[in-house]
């Protein structure tokens, strides 16, 4: 890990003014405390060095990398036309909620979960239906599949939002 204090880092340098204790240990998911890979740093420098910052598009190499990863990791073939890029997870969640449900529909999630999941559902006029994760004797969270199936049938669920890896419980499903 690297010391991010004094780098205008939101989770450390602005904790007190956001009402947090000065000695808080922030355990954020998407704000890492380790240095970015040199390959990524080099690619950023190379891209920035031409000095033009207009809109860009992904080329075939981008899609081929995604396809290769899905093939190696999940033995699953994806098509380029299936890939929809978004600037962030919250917008992607909102797009899915709007595309696959109607106002008043129930959308299933698994609590506890990253709070924007439920906000996006409510903000779009849908109902939050929770299949609560269960903390087992092994001190790991598990899915209650009986409740999961019951909620899908009883609430006529049209969409299930899976958080994977799960935030905040840390499970990879």
Predicted feature residues:
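Conserved core of the PLP fold type I
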Residues: 53-173
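N-terminal small-domain helix-loop-helix segment of the aminotransferase-like
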Residues: 2-88, 95
């Amino acid at each position: 890990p690297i010391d991010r204090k004094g780098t205008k880092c939101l989770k450390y340098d602005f904790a007190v003014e956001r009402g947090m204790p000065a000695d808080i240990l922030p355990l954020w998911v998407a704000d890492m405390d380790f240095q970015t890979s040199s390959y990524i740093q080099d690619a950023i420098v190379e891209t920035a060095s031409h000095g033009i910052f207009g809109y860009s598009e992904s080329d075939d190499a981008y899609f081929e990398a995604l396809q290769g990863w899905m093939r190696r990791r999940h033995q699953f073939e994806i098509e380029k036309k299936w890939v929809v890029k978004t600037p962030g997870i919250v917008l992607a969640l909102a797009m899915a909620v709007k595309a696959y449900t109607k106002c008043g529909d129930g959308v299933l999630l698994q609590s506890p979960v990253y709070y924007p999941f439920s906000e996006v559902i409510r903000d779009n006029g849908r109902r939050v239906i929770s299949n609560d994760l269960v903390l087992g004797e092994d001190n790991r969270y598990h899915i209650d599949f009986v409740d999961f199936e019951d909620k899908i049938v009883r609430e006529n669920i049209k969409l299930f939002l899976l958080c994977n890896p799960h935030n905040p419980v840390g499970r990879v499903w």
